[in-house]
Structures are given as structure tokens and as C-alpha cells.
């Protein structure tokens, strides 16, 4: 009973920390976008605008949140929660340091893939419940995109799993003490990062909520706290994909001089900033190009990487 209470307290602290980090990340992103686009970005609330996310949170919480006419109210309310909750649960198996993990399960990678896949249901359910044609089109795009990119997302990380011989996050990091897997798996790392951006619905893969042709996609009819949960889920997904990339390919918490959790945080921040840089510099492709790249290019390359890794693993284990 005491252990359960301690776990609940640690979980609450972790969730609060993640919410603060996600909010701060929105400010960092807006400042970086302003720098790239030669403008200021938020600079009024707090030092250098660093508390802008707090003001935005207060604004979202005080806005009216009411389902549109003809909407399925229960599903409409549940969809935003499904967008954020699985991503928060995914952080429970992330190893932030040696022994610094909330739930040290042996199938952590598999659990994370499952949690990330659930976010597609939020988009589909929210789109269907909104009773809006633009929302429905965005939801169908989200479903097709997740189906395409979730496949080679899993295949791209299997190379690291094969080299480590385990699905445990801790074991994968420990297997990189001699050399990071990004050196042994450059193709797998690149494919994983591409699929991760698509799984998080980030530019240039944000066609499910493309403003140019779908108003706001599957979140067209959402406002207030419901919109905020979708927004939160997206930014948490970016951080989760960054943390997973660091764990699988960039040595996790391993590094000289500094404590492990600091190394993990710095590496994750670098990957997240790269995602922002991609958003600022790359154009949005056509939807047929997006799916064509997934099925015709990325999937065969993932299978090729898996085949080559299997050959190397078998050759290394041969007497």
C-alpha cells in the first residue's frame, strides 16, 4: 500500500513536470520560429516572453468549451483526453537515468509504440464526433497517415532492439556504452526521426490539421480546454519521440562528466529543437506525396535496414 502511494506521488510529480516542460517548449518553439522568420516572437509576458505559455493556459481554461450542434457529446469530450493521456503514460517507461524510471518494464519499447498509436484514435474520434466535414477529412487523413508511418516507425527501431537483444529501455541504453546505435544504425535513426515527426503530426507532416484546405482539420470544432488537450498532446508527443530517439540511438543518459539525467535532458532538447527547425524550414507536401513516400520509399528502406541488421547480428553470434 505504501509503495502504491509513493508511486502515485511520483507519477503526479512527473506529470506536473511534463506539463511545465511542454508549456516551456511552446515558448521555445515560438521564439525559434521568430528568429528563423526574422521577427520577435512572444516577448511581453515575463522575461523574454518566457511566461507567455502561462498566459495562454489561463486564456484556454477560461474560454467556453461547448460541443457544436449535432455532435456526439460523449465522444467529443473523450477524444481530447485520449490525445494527451497515452502520451503521458508513455513517459512512465522512459529511463531518464540509470534506475530513474517510473515503470521499468521489460517491453518498454513495445508499450511506447502502443501508446503512440492510440493518439490516432483521438483524431478519428474527435473528427467523427464533431459532425463537421472538414473535421472528418482531417480525421481520415490522420488515420491513413498513422497507418502508413506507424509501420515503418516500428520497423526502423527494430534494428536497435536487435543489436541490444532486448525491448527494455534500460538494456538498450546499456548496450550503447561502447558506441551509440546512431553510428551502427544511421538509416534506422533517420527513418525513425522522420516517422516520429509524422506520428506527432508536426510540420511538414501536419496534413490532418492543414489550415490551407481543412480550416483546422480534426480540431476545427474544438475550443477551450478541449483544444488545449489536443495542443498539449501534440507537444508531449514531440518530447516523447525525442526521448525515445535519444534512448534508442543516442546513448540515453550516457555521457562524460555530467550526471545522467542532465545528459538525457540535453540530448532530448537538441532533438526537439531539430523538430522545430524542420517546421520552420520545410514546406508541406501534397497528401499523395506523403503517403507515397511512406509506402514506396520509407517502408522498403526499413525492411532493408532490418535485413542488414539481422545479417550482422547473426554473423556476430556465429562461432
Curated annotation (Swiss-Prot):
It is found in: Cell inner membrane. It comes from the Bacteria. GO terms for molecular function: NADH dehydrogenase activity; oxidoreductase activity, acting on NAD(P)H, quinone or similar compound as acceptor; quinone binding. It is a multi-pass membrane protein. Its main location: membrane. It catalyses: a quinone + NADH + 5 H(+)(in) = a quinol + NAD(+) + 4 H(+)(out). It holds the Pfam family NADHdh. It is an enzyme of class 7 (translocase). GO terms for biological process: aerobic respiration. The chain crosses the membrane at residues 1-21, 77-97, 107-127, 147-167, 179-199, 214-234, 238-258, 262-282, 293-313. GO terms for cellular component: plasma membrane. Belongs to the complex I subunit 1 family. This is NADH-quinone oxidoreductase subunit H 1. It comes from Rhodopseudomonas palustris (strain HaA2). The gene is nuoH1.
Amino acid at each position: 500500500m505504501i509503495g502504491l502511494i509513493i508511486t502515485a506521488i511520483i507519477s503526479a510529480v512527473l506529470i506536473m513536470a511534463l506539463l511545465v516542460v511542454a508549456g516551456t517548449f511552446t515558448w521555445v518553439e515560438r521564439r525559434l520560429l521568430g528568429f528563423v522568420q526574422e521577427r520577435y516572437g512572444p516577448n511581453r509576458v515575463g522575461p523574454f516572453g518566457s511566461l507567455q505559455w502561462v498566459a495562454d493556459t489561463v486564456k484556454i481554461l477560461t474560454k467556453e468549451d461547448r460541443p457544436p450542434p449535432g455532435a456526439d457529446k460523449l465522444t467529443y469530450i473523450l477524444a481530447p483526453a485520449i490525445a494527451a493521456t497515452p502520451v503521458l503514460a508513455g513517459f512512465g517507461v522512459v529511463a531518464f537515468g540509470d534506475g530513474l524510471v517510473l515503470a521499468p518494464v521489460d517491453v518498454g519499447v513495445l508499450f511506447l509504440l502502443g501508446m503512440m498509436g492510440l493518439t490516432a484514435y483521438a483524431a478519428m474520434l474527435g473528427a467523427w464526433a464533431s459532425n463537421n466535414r472538414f473535421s472528418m477529412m482531417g480525421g481520415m487523413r490522420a488515420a491513413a497517415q498513422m497507418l502508413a508511418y506507424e509501420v515503418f516507425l516500428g520497423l526502423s527501431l527494430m534494428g536497435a532492439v536487435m543489436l541490444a537483444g532486448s525491448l527494455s529501455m534500460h538494456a538498450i541504453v546499456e548496450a550503447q556504452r561502447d558506441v551509440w546505435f546512431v553510428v551502427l544504425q544511421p538509416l534506422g535513426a533517420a527513418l525513425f526521426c522522420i516517422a516520429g515527426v509524422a506520428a506527432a503530426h508536426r510540420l511538414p507532416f501536419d496534413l490532418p490539421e492543414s489550415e490551407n484546405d481543412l480550416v483546422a482539420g480534426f480540431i476545427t470544432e474544438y475550443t477551450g480546454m478541449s483544444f488545449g488537450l489536443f495542443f498539449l498532446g501534440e507537444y508531449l508527443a514531440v518530447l516523447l519521440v525525442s526521448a525515445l530517439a535519444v534512448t534508442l540511438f543516442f546513448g540515453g543518459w550516457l555521457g562524460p562528466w555530467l550526471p545522467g539525467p542532465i545528459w538525457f535532458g540535453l540530448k532530448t532538447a537538441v532533438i526537439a529543437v531539430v523538430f522545430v527547425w524542420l517546421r520552420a524550414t520545410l514546406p508541406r507536401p501534397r497528401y499523395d506525396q506523403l503517403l507515397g513516400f511512406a509506402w514506396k520509399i520509407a517502408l522498403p528502406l526499413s525492411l532493408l535496414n532490418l535485413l542488414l541488421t539481422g545479417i550482422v547480428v547473426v554473423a556476430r553470434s556465429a562461432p
